[in-house]
């Protein structure tokens, strides 16, 4: 690596010695991994290379991401809030570009919601390339794919090998979720193939082919352990007996004990409320299948560790390890999708090369992965936004090897940290003169050197209606499923069990006002609706965003229930919005799949108010002739209890219908309930309307 004299910018607040000799920079990013999965954060998964990296580095115990894949990548790559970079919601994926509109469904016509990195931000790669670095990437991009101008080589990287989409098969990535080398799509790889290994091998190839002594930046963004569950059999066998014999209750307790012993969590931290059955309540078959799913997930994490070790070994052999800044972190908390206790997808599809979106390991194991925190990916509770962060730089850490850093930080801090380490200058303009947003993050070095008590006065989050703000010990949050803001003393209560909103209304009001000011300033609240009579639910991805509305008056206001389809054809849900004038609506909650019969989704709601209770009737989705009508009720219009006998209705198949029931509408008249529904003739050709009474 060449030595250079650098000029300090106002951004560089640490001594000049940090960047006198430019270091290499390596960022490892993993996908959907929980806070407590790896060994050095309390996990039982064997991760010896990461554990060793942590022993020679610093572990952050309160580092935060944005709770979702592509928004997290946007923030990490740019040092901005994801909305500033154009990815407030989701990024482009296969099938999201609509020819009829010549527009991606993730492009809402608002600066904060374009679905790809905009031109008012720069990536770490773009900045470092301008400052004398080689720039390489391997792995998952997920920051724009419809048009080469959005690909890695057009955003600062010299070489790229990986996937542009948000998910792909580990064993045979192909089609729109296939592999890309530089600017060329590749055919499906020959078996045996595994993405984690291939990404690392290509990354090391890029670095090894370098002809000069310039420093390099390597961004190695694994798609592991994101679904689908696919791993090498020899790795799976290392974990199957462990999870079958102990189950999630014991695993969770053992993780918790190790985390406290390590100092990862404070002694006063308990467990978040458990949302699932105990392990002993499962059937033997359920235990077998669920333990195997967790074993595959653990094998995916274990393989990541092995490949991190390959990179470290290369740096050692080439005598570059001491002056290489290494960061390891996750894009969000563990993933519970599709929010079923035991996971989504069929058991026989595990390790099926043709699968690229399911199966998954389920809500119970996801909550275990996030021990001891509340919730998971997409939510702004600690389980959704907390990530391990290992910071290693042998040459500069001095006697801080193995330390824990308890000062909170978050993704916008990565870019300023890299700039301070490398001495690179952050531009005011780029992309042909475009004005670049100023950085919102700050360098992590003052936290590592313990020169400051904190890095941020406020920290902010928003994704799909999940909102949060942290101010000192206080954290205010409004969850996608709730109607009110909650308030927690996050130092005393990091598992967010004791809502203090009613005890400290002034604190909550201050934080809400601050969050709303931030949301307006940074394009979090989209301004793209052309008329107050238009409504688009921005809390979920959709195709379209809202349909099948049903409006009822309730408690002096109006409630609207509507279908909210995601990308793809499974996981439909029901959105809830409220209004006082029938034109201005705001989302206040949702119903997501919560049982096996709803695994592929629920939609087409109809509502009825009786005795101050809302009765919601809706259909299951994606089961063809087996789709049926379900029932739930609520006293507040938002929090619903499912009928224990769901599905409650499907017509008996006969000479006039096929046995299917969808699109429910219920009225009460003449002392009876009349259920109107759509069905089909036995040949499944003609759609007709049926009626049933109760």
Model-predicted segments: where are they?
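Short, intrinsically disordered low-complexity segments
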Residues: 1-2, 72, 139, 373, ...
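Sec-dependent signal peptide hydrophobic core
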Residues: 5-10
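Beta-rich carbohydrate-recognition and catalytic domains
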Residues: 36-38, 98, 529-663, 667-694
